[in-house]
């Protein structure tokens, strides 16, 4: 089950403000349902060279997902931190397999208000 995280400072340390800004921009995109951190940062074992893995779940038609991915890629380009972002449909959470299983098990939903 995906846990909720609102403590950006505790998770991202010195990159907290940048990540909050990036998540706010992602959250402003049409059809975004949730932003989930997964990988080493979510498991609490990130190293200085670790990338930041984000899964963004959308409520949109398949035809729109490619466009949303392009928007995500533009938002997440950052010279300071390595962000790897993947778009998914929310229906993929209903029967998780593969990477969705990891996201479901270890993921932290990043909420920004």
Predicted features and spans:
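Short, well-ordered beta-strand segments
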Residues: 53-55
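Glycine-rich beta-strand-to-loop/alpha-helix junction loops that act as flexible
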Residues: 38-40
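Catalytic core of pol beta-like nucleotidyltransferases
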Residues: 1-34, 43-48, 58-113
């Amino acid at each position: 089950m995906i846990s909720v995280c609102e403590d950006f400072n505790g998770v991202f340390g010195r990159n907290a403000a940048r990540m909050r800004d990036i998540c706010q921009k992602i959250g402003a995109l049409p059809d975004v349902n949730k932003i989930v951190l997964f990988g080493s940062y979510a498991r609490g074992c990130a190293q200085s060279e670790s990338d930041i893995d984000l899964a963004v779940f959308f409520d949109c038609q398949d035809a729109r997902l490619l466009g949303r991915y392009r928007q995500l890629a533009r938002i997440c380009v950052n010279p300071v931190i390595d962000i790897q972002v993947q778009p998914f449909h929310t229906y993929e959470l209903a029967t998780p397999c593969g990477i969705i299983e990891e996201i479901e098990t270890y993921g932290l939903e990043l909420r920004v208000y």
